[in-house]
């Protein structure tokens, strides 16, 4: 049941164009009381409306907690999404949460956008 709940959460939800902040979030399934927790998945969320990385984390974690999931922010960065050129570049870091593991974020983005050129770098802010 818990795994089914996690499966319904999209791995990636990012805006379609522009440069914006993103966070990598680990979502934990709400375990049954007699079973140990342990099932989790990492998700990528990035939006232009967010002034701070915490704005994204607070909104997403609040929505998921209402469904019984625990969340932790693994870090953040920026995404440059050029849909016309079919390119996404992941880079930078979050002042509050630190640098996300961009290689993990990039793999998840590649799975959602298989016909895009998806790259990452640790440099930049």
UniProtKB/Swiss-Prot annotation:
GO molecular function: protein histidine phosphatase activity
Residues of the active site: 53
Key words, A-Z: Acetylation, Cytoplasm, Hydrolase, Protein phosphatase
Source domain of life: Eukaryota
EC number: 3.9.1.3
InterPro entries in alphabetical order: Janus, Janus_sf
SUPFAM superfamilies hit by this protein: PHP14-like
GO cellular component: cytosol
Modified-residue entries (N-acetylalanine), positions: 2
Amino acids binding substrate: 21, 94-96
Catalysis performed (reactions): N(pros)-phospho-L-histidyl-[protein] + H2O = L-histidyl-[protein] + phosphate; N(tele)-phospho-L-histidyl-[protein] + H2O = L-histidyl-[protein] + phosphate
Location in the cell: Cytoplasm
Role played: Exhibits phosphohistidine phosphatase activity. May have a significant involvement in neuronal signaling.
UniProt record similarity statement: Belongs to the janus family.
Oligomer and partners: Monomer.
Name the UniProt record assigns to this protein: 14 kDa phosphohistidine phosphatase
Organism, as annotated: Oryctolagus cuniculus
């Amino acid at each position: 049941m818990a795994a089914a709940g996690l499966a319904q959460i999209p791995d990636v939800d990012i805006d379609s164009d522009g440069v914006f902040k993103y966070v990598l979030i680990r979502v934990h399934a709400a375990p049954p009381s007699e079973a140990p927790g342990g099932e989790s998945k990492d998700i990528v969320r990035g939006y232009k409306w967010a002034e701070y990385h915490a704005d994204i984390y607070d909104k997403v974690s609040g929505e998921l907690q209402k469904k019984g999931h625990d969340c932790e922010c693994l870090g953040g960065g920026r995404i440059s999404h050029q849909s016309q050129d079919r390119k996404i570049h992941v880079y930078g870091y979050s002042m509050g949460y630190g640098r996300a593991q961009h290689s993990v974020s990039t793999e998840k983005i590649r799975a959602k956008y298989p016909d895009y050129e998806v790259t990452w770098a640790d440099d930049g802010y």
